[in-house]
Amino acid sequence: MFLAAIHVITFFISENSKSFYTMSTPTSAFNAMLDDIGIEIQDDISALCSTLADPSDAEPAPPVHDVDDLLASVGPDKRKKIRSGLLTIHPPSSHPSWLKPETWFPQCDDILEIWCAKFEKGEDTGNLHVHIYFKLKHSNTIRFELLQKWITKHVTGFDFKPQRSATKNSTQCVVNYVLKPETSVGDPFIWNASCAFDQKTWDARHKGKGKKQEIIDHIMARDWTLSWASLVHESDESRALLADCGWGKRFQEDRAAAQPRRKIKDVVILYGAAGTGKTTMAMDWDSKPDETTKARYYRRSCDEDFWGGGATAYNGQRVIHYDEFGGQEKFASLKEITSIGLPGPPVKVKGSGRDLNHDTVVFTSNVHPAGWYKGVWAKDPHQFKPFQRRVTKVLFFPRERPDGTENVPSDGNPAHFVDQTPEWVAFGDNLDLAIEHAESCWPLPATIEDDGGGAFAPGFSLTSEPEPKRRRFF
């Protein structure tokens, strides 16, 4: 139907041009009426003619295998103009009127081209719902906010997905999705014989994958620890497939969140001289042949509160490594991160948050662990015990090997270390025993200032000036 307003005269011309009507009304009032019912009006006869035949309908289209490939999301723009799409509604009953267009759409005879509807029950929930596919005539569109107004007059909630492209092939695929007999509850409703289930098109969906399934398969074949940026730019194939995929980033992030929650079982300290192989051992800790280093291992930087971001973000790795550690992590946080038998705490990742999902913490340090939190332990020596009992293994890397040669690992000559776990366990809650142990095997600066300097815990700095009134740790 072609409608145009010229000043105060409105012309109504039928599509076959056999009827002609005139009426007089103020232009502003007429425009307000059109805006209220949400019908988009063509400005001239050439625009009308261009929409009476959809050129894409005449072009062959490949079979569509997933109805989600044909549908989009409305997005935040509630004034978005809609011509066709899939409605899902949860009506209060199974009365046939819920399937009919006049229940939902005013003036349906004037604006509808296709309408089909059917009751279904959810496979998982068993809840009754209605699937409706509608397509408006070429000269008509409605805004989403108006559709929402019409639907919510009768029900409180609904889901709507607009059709990406209203070609014949895509339209038939969505019609088939609504009318498929295997999920029907009762008979479907088809308005004015405007469409029908097509078995040939329905069968063709099994001959290949839809794009969404292709994307899912591509993502699932990659490591779940990969960041979205790394996954997209992995190859030309990935870039072509994933560059414009809006939901893929969240899908990949949810893979990490879906991993089973681990419980912390090991807290390991590797301390001693520099260059003796501590960091190399930490990076290889508990490695497995079928597991990549990136999937297993994460090095924690204490220079910031965040646990990385983007490609450097923590992403569910099971081994967390603190390198060059001297107490930089807040003591309260460290206790949570090393709580044996419990899952890791939530942490901040740039742009989001994440639960730590590790089972092992490895510390490498040039400092004896008795000095890591000297400020905390000087104020309250009883705070040493919660830390001491969390540690399950302590390995000391001396500067020299037993034969007097330098302790530098090489091919065929692995790092030399001494297992001091029994001594560590024997400390119990006695901080003084730990201090004496440090004095005997790995001397450290004579005193520790409470000035917050250096890269260590607040209060840890190196000095040669004695202060006998302060507690001696080493």
Swiss-Prot record:
Molecular-function annotations in GO: RNA binding; RNA helicase activity
Presence of keyword Transmembrane helix: no
Gene3D superfamilies (UniProt xref): 3.40.1310.20
Annotated motif Nuclear localization signal, positions: 248-255
Compartments in which it is found: Host nucleus
InterPro entries associated with the record: Helicase_SF3_ssDNA/RNA_vir
Chief location bin: host cell
GO cellular component: host cell nucleus
Disordered as annotated region, ranges: 455-474
UniProt keyword list: Host nucleus
Function (record text): Plays an essential for the replication of viral DNA. Presumably cleaves viral genomic dsRNA replicative form to initiate rolling circle replication.
Protein name: Replication-associated protein
